[in-house]
Amino acid sequence: MALEEIQRDADEWIRKHTPGYFTPLMMLARLTEELGELSRAVSHHHGEKKPKPGEEKGNIQDEIGDLLFVLVCLANDLGISMDDAWRGLLRKLYERDVDRWKS
């Protein structure tokens, strides 16, 4: 699925099921919250800190999906094309950082 399609799907859902997008600062807070949930799930599955008794490990795939949804909503609200953002990142990696990670 292309990033443009993901953005369109998120926008359709927001328009049908909510009064609209949260403010950018609220979405940034939501991103932080979702990143924390992803961090906890990764830590529980792969880190030293295991879940407390009775606490679920969390589903890493689900947490990545939650994080992606909020990021896409932020991009939509700010009028940013995720495709353009991705192409810009790749250009930066291939031009500026092409030799940065070679051993």
For the regions a language model picked out, list residue spans one by one.
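Flexible "arm" and connector segments at domain edges
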Residues: 1-64, 68-103
